[in-house]
Amino acid sequence: DDDEMYASFQRCAELGAMPLVHAENGDVVAQLQAKLMEESNNGPEAHAYSRPPEVEGEATNRAIMIADMAGVPLYVVHVSCEQAHEAIRRARQKGMRVYGEPLIQHLLLDESEYAHPNWDHAAQRVMSPPFRNKLHQDSLWAGLQAGSLQVVATDHCAFTTAQKRTGIGDFTKIPNGTGGLEERMPLLWTYGVETGRLTMN
């Protein structure tokens, strides 16, 4: 709830701490999940449908505004879409202390992963926020180039195939998370530095 977020941010300001937020509008996500399940859309692809970029962009903007009112800097984790990146970029242009972190997975994998005919393949890529299309990836790379996004992380949270299969028939029960810790730096070098998108520094 926003009142709890504001109170938490105020306490962080008192302590000199910087809060981290995973920005998605959970109320809207829950409504979309219920609608998709009612329509028997229960596979891994529905995970992405239930978490469109708008729920992330709205939540990112709201968290930024609340943090600013509380007088605390903010670190936004798992930035996956243009809407969230733009909220961060605009806030930084206004002098707000906001930092954004895309994941290597969001920079390189897109939403087509969820349409894979092999259920296990698609489920192994279920994470939140979900993968987006190439336009969102381009925005994230541009943010890293321009400095409006600062860190590339992994949110490493791997599950076995058996664990992922607990969501067969109900995408909301697929454990959210993928690996990435070991691969992050080589992939960032190959697809960032070697392509000229990023410098070594």
What are these regions (language model features)?
Residues 162-173:
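Basic, amphipathic juxtamembrane/active-site segments
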Residues 177-201:
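C-terminal structural cap/anchor segments
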